């Protein structure tokens, strides 16, 4: 029982393939590189996939029993897979946030996958651990993060700060929330977990709510504090203070605040310094989520957006968004790594070793949720070395400049308006109500609620019409009840001419949409 009979082994046919044959790897690898290079030459036309649900049903229902050639497989990729791909690297991709690729990022990923190490602790692959610590310090220095967030070679520094590469912001937030939870429960008793409260704005990424659920926070104790146009949808410190005081009055325990630099809907920026001042009065762990906009803060002119970060407990950004590093690569820095380790560490006998026992190495398995971990630092290292700080800043500034160009094009068309300030490289705009209703808004008896509903509806139709054309791809958000179209510049291949072309496409579809509008709603 529990073993395979030897007669079965003897009767098995011997496979003639070696899954890791160096010569075949070289041959097939060249084919893949050529395939992808050709893909990038031709990705300049379409952006969003026009496939319908179930489009992959043409593929076989079962796996092949015998091997197939790489030539056949690549042909199927061309015919069956690519038509169902939304082309995130297209220069005409302006949706969500960018997933900016680069040659260095791709090649770094290739090296990482090629070595295929599992660097859960230092002993399992020393170079993977030590390179990660180095690149996290490099990037932290580029951001001008305080030394309390960086690794120190000075044994007398007394700092337990440092950085770790997570998969996504969701993981980074979950890790820091778990660390703060355990730190607090060790003080007040684990039986009081239902008293813990998590704070954010109504613009904070949904990753925080998911993390709170996983960490066992009572859903009733999740505070999404309302924002408004008056603060450009940033979180008000006074609103935070009032909410905290009300919770304390109710016998609850403030635990965790997630402040955002560059919200998903509108790239709003929470005031880090003032929020930290409020939070620190109550011992609240402050995490700064700069998933999108953090990359821009390597440029001195954007660094002020994270002023006050020295008072926060943790900080993260996604290098796979706007830093030319392939998915997944979330950079997390913490001041107190001991809190992470205490909350997340495990020490089974089969992982014990002298290096870990010496306390002179980092075991990154204790800084994350999973045990296994990828060699993510390799691709970030290649990006930093291949382009250098000066070029990376130049790339980012070019995207901001293109967004300002788009902003200027909108300003010249009186039918449109900018809904929220253009802070980084995303423009949020909409068709004005006046453009939709032909100047009838000043008439008596106008139902302004109906006007806003109709305006939102028309802007939604405009977006869907543009996206259905396949020429460009944008997405939307709703802030303060206003439906707006998001134009996010950041694809590596995008040039100013693509932005100008996108605007022409938008204008053409606007002309068509406005020609069919029924403005009887104002009557």
UniProtKB/Swiss-Prot annotation:
PROSITE patterns: DDC_GAD_HDC_YDC. Belongs to the group II decarboxylase family. Its cofactor is pyridoxal 5'-phosphate. One of its GO terms (molecular function) is tyrosine decarboxylase activity. InterPro entries: Aromatic_deC, PyrdxlP-dep_de-COase, PyrdxlP-dep_Trfase, PyrdxlP-dep_Trfase_major, PyrdxlP-dep_Trfase_small, Pyridoxal-P_BS. The gene is TYDC5. It comes from the Eukaryota. GO terms for biological process: amino acid metabolic process; carboxylic acid metabolic process. Homodimer. May play an important role in providing precursors for alkaloid synthesis in the roots and germinating seedlings. The keyword Lyase applies. Its EC number is 4.1.1.28, 4.1.1.25. Roots. Pfam families: Pyridoxal_deC. Keywords: Decarboxylase, Lyase, Pyridoxal phosphate. The modification N6-(pyridoxal phosphate)lysine is found at residue 321. Residues 1-19 have a biased composition (Polar residues). The keyword Lyase applies. This is Tyrosine/DOPA decarboxylase 5.
């Amino acid at each position: 029982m529990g073993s395979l009979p030897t007669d079965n082994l003897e009767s098995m046919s011997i496979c003639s393939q070696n899954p890791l044959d160096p010569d075949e790897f070289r041959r097939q690898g060249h084919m893949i590189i050529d395939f992808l290079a050709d893909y990038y030459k031709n990705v300049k036309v379409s952006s969003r996939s026009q496939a319908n649900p179930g489009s992959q049903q043409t593929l076989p229902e079962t796996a092949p029993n015998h091997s197939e050639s790489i030539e056949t497989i690549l042909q199927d990729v061309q015919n069956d897979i690519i038509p169902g791909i939304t082309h995130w690297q297209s220069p005409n991709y302006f949706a969500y946030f960018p997933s900016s690729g680069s040659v260095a990022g791709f090649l770094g990923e290739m090296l990482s996958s090629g070595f295929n190490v599992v660097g859960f602790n230092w002993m399992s692959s020393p170079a993977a651990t030590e390179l990660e610590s180095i690149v996290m310090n490099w990037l932290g220095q580029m951001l001008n993060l305080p030394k309390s967030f960086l690794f120190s070679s000075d044994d007398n520094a007394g700092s337990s700060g440092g950085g770790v590469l997570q998969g996504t912001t969701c993981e980074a937030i979950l890790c820091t929330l778990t660390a703060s939870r355990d730190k607090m429960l060790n003080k007040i008793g684990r039986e009081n977990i239902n008293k813990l409260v998590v704070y954010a704005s109504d613009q904070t990424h949904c990753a925080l709510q998911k993390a709170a659920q996983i960490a066992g926070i009572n859903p009733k104790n999740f505070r999404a504090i309302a924002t408004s146009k008056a603060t450009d949808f940033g979180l008000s410190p006074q609103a935070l203070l009032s909410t905290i005081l009300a919770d304390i009055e109710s016998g609850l325990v403030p635990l965790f605040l997630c402040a955002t630099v560059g919200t998903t809907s509108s790239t709003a920026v929470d005031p880090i310094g003032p929020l930290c001042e409020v939070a620190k009065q109550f011992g609240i762990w402050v995490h700064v989520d700069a998933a999108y906009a953090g990359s821009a803060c390597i440029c001195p002119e954007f660094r002020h957006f994270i002023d006050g970060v020295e008072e926060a407990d943790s900080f993260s950004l996604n290098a796979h968004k706007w830093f030319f590093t392939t998915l997944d690569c979330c950079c997390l820095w913490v001041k107190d790594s001991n809190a992470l380790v205490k909350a997340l560490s495990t020490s089974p006998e089969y992982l014990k070793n002298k290096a870990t026992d010496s306390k002179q190495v980092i075991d990154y398995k204790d800084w994350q949720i999973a045990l296994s971990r990828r060699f993510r630092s390799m691709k970030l290292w290649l990006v930093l070395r291949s382009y250098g700080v000066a070029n990376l800043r130049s790339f980012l500034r070019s995207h901001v400049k293109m967004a300002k160009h788009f902003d200027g094009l909108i300003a010249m068309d009186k039918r449109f308006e900018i809904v929220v300030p253009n802070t980084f490289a995303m423009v949020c705009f909409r068709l004005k109500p006046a453009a939709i209703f032909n100047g009838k808004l000043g008439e008596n008896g106008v139902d302004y609620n109906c006007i806003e509903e109709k305006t939102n509806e028309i802007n939604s139709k405009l977006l869907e019409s543009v996206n259905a054309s396949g020429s460009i791809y944008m997405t939307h958000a709703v802030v303060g009840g206003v439906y707006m179209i998001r134009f996010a510049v950041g694809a590596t291949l995008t040039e100013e001419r693509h932005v100008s072309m996108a605007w022409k496409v938008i204008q053409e579809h606007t002309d068509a949409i406005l020609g069919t509008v029924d403005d009887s709603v104002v009557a």
